[in-house]
């Protein structure tokens, strides 16, 4: 998602924190990432209806986005997808702020994911229960 001059790309499919248990049971290998809704619960809050129904073209006409944010987010998403498909993905969340000229990521480590879901590394490394 993106705002006027900033945005993020979030990868993940586990919709419950409990399902993250054992995600790092095999060292250096992650079997699941928290869903975007877990990473940023604010994404699940209903937005103003007028903002929901605007297309990218309408948003551009309304000057609701800077001229470069869509390209920056699309490039970041493409890079993350290619790395996911090639088995070289090391990050699960990337953020861009065009106004400040910054970009940063959250990396696929037990420490970083534990911080996002509010659980200790031990939870992520423990044996998953069926």
Which residue ranges define each predicted feature?
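Glycine-rich phosphate/adenylate-binding loop
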Residues: 1-130
């Amino acid at each position: 998602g993106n705002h006027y001059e900033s945005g993020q790309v979030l990868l993940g499919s586990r919709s419950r924190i409990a399902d993250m248990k054992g995600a790092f049971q095999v060292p250096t290998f992650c079997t699941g990432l928290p869903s975007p809704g877990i990473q940023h619960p604010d994404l699940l809050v209903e937005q103003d209806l007028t903002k929901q129904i605007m297309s990218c073209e309408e948003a551009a006409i309304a000057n609701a986005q800077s001229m470069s944010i869509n390209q920056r987010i699309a490039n970041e998403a493409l890079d993350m997808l290619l790395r996911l498909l090639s088995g070289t993905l090391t990050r699960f969340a990337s953020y861009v702020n065009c106004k400040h000229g910054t970009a940063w990521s959250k990396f696929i480590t037990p420490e970083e994911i534990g911080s996002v879901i509010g659980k200790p590394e031990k939870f992520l490394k423990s044996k998953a229960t069926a």
